[in-house]
Amino acid sequence: MKIIISPAKTFKIRKLKKENIDCLFENKKNALVSIMKEKSIEELKSMWKCSDKIAEESYKLYKNFDVSPKGCAIRSFDGIQYQYMDVDSLDEDKLEYLEEHLRILSGLYGILRPFDQISKYRLDFEDKFINLYEFWEDEIRNHFEGEEIIDLASKEYGQNIYKYLDKAPVKIEFKEEVLIDGDIKLKTKATPSKILRGRMVNYMARNHIENIEQLKKFSCDGYNYSEKNSDKKKLVFVKSLVSE
């Protein structure tokens, strides 16, 4: 079983006692870095539709990439989901569970294990650069071949790689019941979903979850597994009625 998650756009480069010196696909990562080093500030600004400041910072990141600080992937990404994984609370046994089961999808690195060393970067799968889905197609297909996959990634990173997989992943969704015009509807809220995706990863590590049935027992912040809203392709966890 493999759990897939998205990277974060923010970083705090931090070390872990045990780290992998090389990532899984070092040569292809280096090829992308070489291409990015040739980009001008104006080209980066156009590609990302970003401010001068972001383009200049990213330009410097790639120019200095080979000597930039490196840290453990699971501790160096600093988005909401990663903060709520709370990996610093996990002992070695639980971290080893994550190293075996958790995979981070990345535009630059392709697929990252938790202990892989990374540097700060900016490159998403949907950037107007090259088709990174096709660039990483063989690695994605081969790495996940035959695996049961739990999808805790954003749509950009998760569902867009489904066509390269031999087994359909199980998507995890978190929804709230809300009252709209007298009817109860299910609504997904971005920030609570990111928090819960992080907490679910922590839960899976603490409980050494190995299958879907075990995962259905997850309960957090009022969200519980909803059989009637779930099917073979997704597990839905619902928080009971909140008026809106």
Curated annotation (Swiss-Prot):
One GO BP annotation here?
response to hydroperoxide
Recorded hits in InterPro entries, A to Z, give: YaaA (IPR005583)
Q: Which GO terms describe its cellular component?
A: cytosol
Any Pfam family from its record, for instance, is H2O2_YaaD
- Check the record and name the PANTHER family matching this protein: PEROXIDE STRESS RESISTANCE PROTEIN YAAA, PEROXIDE STRESS RESPONSE PROTEIN YAAA
Q: What family does the Swiss-Prot or TrEMBL record give for this protein? A: Belongs to the UPF0246 family.
What protein is this chain from?
UPF0246 protein FMG_1068
Q: Which organism is it from?
A: Finegoldia magna (strain ATCC 29328 / DSM 20472 / WAL 2508)
Provide the organism lineage as a comma list.
Bacteria, Bacillati, Bacillota, Tissierellia, Tissierellales
